[in-house]
Amino acid sequence: MPLRLPDGLPAIDILKRENINIEDMLTKEDDKRPLRIVILNLMPFKATTETDFIRILSNSPLLLDINFMKLKSHASKHTPAEHMDRFYHTLEELSKEKIDGMIVTGAPVEGIPFEEVDYWTELQEIFNWARENVRSTLYICWAAQAGLYHFYDIPKYPLPKKMFGIFPTIPLKPEQPLFRGFDDVFRMPQSRHTEVRREDIEQVDDLEVIAESEESGVSIVRSRSRREFFITGHLEYAPDTLDTEYRRDLGKRDDVEVPKYYYREDNPDKGPLVTWRSHANLLFMNWISWVLGGE
């Protein structure tokens, strides 16, 4: 199904090299109103994250209008200002038209207390606005922790070592529309140094843990009263993301552990074995269908 993307977005050419011909999906005019999705991209390397999400959203059976949001209170250090000016808009600009769904990405700030993040106040304002004006929001990784803390005072805790790998995860509520078509076990990429804990979530009546891993802990939390989901991992990750991260860290220190359940035979030289892609696509497609249907 066609997508609407900003003209000239680098992700279009990147995905073409992966034999995903986004150009064939692009459209400017259509009789139907597209489902408008806004991605608040908090990651430092914007183009990589843009590509990850467009790759997975390109499987949508519905017409999507993809937009990217930027913060006013924080300037990206790793993405050119020209890119931000051309492809990103503020909340004030984007909120002039109806937004159906919103995705808030992770951010490399989990070692900092929430209140000390330089854009925390603006982020809180965006969270509050989304809750009142967007049909459904997905909070990813650090954003999931930030959303749970902002709305429900759920703390984050440092882990003794990095949670790093592709972890078997159980859908505890298979009847949830988000899990339609899921197997009894799916795998979720994790890359984090902190966690939220079930015992804190269980103290909040409005929250429910709907997916969990024996090894990596709480995986997906939902709001019972709103269409908000807090996902602690990165189902959107490309096949080589953890490999890139592993080799980057290996160049900095010697005590880096190999990501679990990721490489063939646990051998980095043999490359990653992709085990999460189909369920990742299914989860995002279920979310899009639910956003539109408003069940």
Residues covered by each model-derived region:
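Amide-donor transfer/coupling interface in amidating biosynthetic enzymes
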Residues: 1-73, 89-94, 98, 125, ...
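Short, glycine/acidic-enriched capping/hinge loops at junctions between secondary-structure elements
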Residues: 49-52, 78-81, 114-115
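N-terminal beta-loop-helix "entrance" segment that forms/cooperates
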Residues: 72-85
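Short, Asp-centered acidic motifs that coordinate Mg2+ and/or phosphate
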Residues: 101
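Cysteine-nucleophile active-site neighborhood
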Residues: 104-173
